Amino acid sequence: MDASAEQSLPEPGSQDSVAGDDIEIVVNVGGVRQVLYGDLLSQYPETRLAELINCLAGGYDTIFSLCDDYDPGKREFYFDRDPDAFKCVIEVYYFGEVHMKKGICPICFKNEMDFWKVDLKFLDDCCKSHLSEKREELEEIARRVQLILDDLGVDAAEGRWRRCQKCVWKFLEKPESSCPARVVAVLSFLLILVSSVVMCMGTIPELQVVDSEGNRVEHPTLENVETACIGWFTLEYLLRLFSSPNKLHFALSFMNIVDVLAILPFYVSLTLTHLGARMMELTNVQQAVQALRIMRIARIFKLARHSSGLQTLTYALKRSFKELGLLLMYLAVGIFVFSALGYTMEQSHPETLFKSIPQSFWWAIITMTTVGYGDIYPKTTLGKLNAAISFLCGVIAIALPIHPIINNFVRYYNKQRVLETAAKHELELMELNSSSAESKPGGSRSDLDTLPPEPAAREGPSWGSRLKLSHSDTFIPLLTEEKHHRTRLQSCK
């Protein structure tokens, strides 16, 4: 553009620069120039680009409040933003919706949309799922960082009783916190295995003894080992309940309910045996005790507390609820159909084993699940053909949901590894920032401490840019109260 053309361009605030539908502007985002027109941008007047058209009627102060720089000669607005994200954002003016390209961080893209004042409702549903997933990941990272900070933090204002509770809770719930805590976790794991083995060995006739009443009971040595294990489980549960910050939530959590089910049958059976001996009703009491002893198998689920793999498998099964429901529904329909067909086709045989349709359900179940128990089997040609078809349908029904379940397991397992690593990196970054702040001469105040005070932070993680150092700042803090956390890290060193 020559000098005469540049002189003919209107200045901001002049009558010729008033926004119009035919006005043309140039937007330079991260070195990428884009020519836009007023009639296109005016479709969404609440967006930042539409405000650029309107601000031409104002002064330079209005313009520089919306962009990083402005060239009046070229009527070009400069922004130090992500050009790739900008190309996606301006799609709203052409297509009425926004799609996020692959490889762009969903949280950063959301910040870009906020900067350009494009509402999230224009983001397509296929992209909102990625944003929601990334938000959940950051929330989980923030939660883990907060838990670690709570464990590291020592509040001098707290009483000795409260500090003791925190130490006990950390000792029992955080095996990685210290070597003694790791030893206790390993010991608890071994005792779970020992108690489970003892429970199984107690049912071996060769290891049982005969009591004074002539009944076969467990060997006294096995009973003593089980009593010792139950004593350890009881002590562990009571200490964890005593040190829990939220006792109601602790008591209602699944793993703690499993702990209660693992130790409660022992005390109930002991009480019933004592009362039965006094009331001379040993027969009924022994039946109740035997029923309660079955509940001892719940202690094997205590292993899930010490195994991240079992927890991941449980979560994968929860996430695969739809696939499992589809499998059960498919099997239920197949069992009903093939059992009815098998019963009908086998009635012509004089020695048929299919006495009724409900009785044929058992045959259909073991056939479709590829077990083939063999107590009930078809004898006619049509019955055998029906069995072959039911077998093939069962194989297909079981194989279909396996792949989604495995994918959910692998995805969640990898996600947990990534979240753990991200939480550790976030803590290392906080500690590095606190160390650099302490190394500065004249005190431990950093540049962050000299910033103007922030408005009251809302609870939970902050997704927006908290430190507005420039229009281009894309810092995404995981936690809102950064100064507070930095101080706590300093005090924990």
UniProtKB/Swiss-Prot annotation:
This is Voltage-gated potassium channel regulatory subunit KCNF1. Belongs to the potassium channel family. F (TC 1.A.1.2) subfamily. Kv5.1/KCNF1 sub-subfamily. Residues 358-378 dip into the membrane without crossing it. GO terms for biological process: action potential; non-motile cilium assembly; potassium ion transmembrane transport; potassium ion transport; protein homooligomerization; regulation of potassium ion transport. Heterotetramer with KCNB1 or KCNB2. One of its GO terms (cellular component) is ciliary base. Expressed in brain namely in the piriform cortex, olfactory tubercle, and medial habenular nucleus. Also expressed in the medial amygdaloid nuclei and the lateral amygdaloid area. It is found in: Cell membrane. Pfam families: BTB_2, Ion_trans. It is a multi-pass membrane protein. InterPro entries: Ion_trans_dom (IPR005821), K_chnl_volt-dep_Kv (IPR003968), K_chnl_volt-dep_Kv5/Kv9 (IPR003971), KCNF1-like_BTB_POZ (IPR048010), SKP1/BTB/POZ_sf (IPR011333), T1-type_BTB (IPR003131), VG_K_chnl (IPR028325), Volt_channel_dom_sf (IPR027359). It comes from Rattus norvegicus (Rat). Residues 205-223, 271-289, 346-357, 379-385 are extracellular. A motif (Selectivity filter) lies at residues 370-375. One of its GO terms (molecular function) is voltage-gated potassium channel activity.
